[in-house]
Regions:
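Conserved catalytic or regulatory cores that recognize and/or transform ribose-phosphate-containing ligands
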Residues: 1-97
Length: 97
């Protein structure tokens, strides 16, 4: 069973949760998510940096990343995550071809 970290814009948070559920229930994958349900909470710069570092550690632990590129959208942060994953020999799967 492979482990994947989901990478995508937070504007697709709901979709990332749906994809994680699908991958775990239908594709026999383990999924490391980065979506947190914190209504009306704005993280501090320090918290954002900690979350970013944790996300890269999740990529290190994973066999690959699953890029949620809805309508072809890949932002700056996700582009960096893709490059990081490739540099570390990780599989990169794109949601939209």
């Amino acid at each position: 069973m492979k482990t994947y970290t989901i990478c995508g814009s937070m504007k697709f948070a709901k979709e990332m949760q749906e994809v994680a559920y699908y991958l775990e229930t239908q594709q026999d994958c383990n999924v490391l998510q980065c979506v947190y349900t914190l209504d009306d909470y704005k993280p501090t710069k320090e918290e954002l940096k900690k979350l970013e570092l944790a996300h890269y550690q999740k990529i290190d632990l994973s066999d690959g990343i699953y890029v949620l590129n809805i309508n072809g959208y890949i932002g700056e942060s996700v582009s960096k995550e893709i490059e990081y994953a490739k540099m570390h020999g990780k599989e990169v799967i794109y949601h939209c071809k």
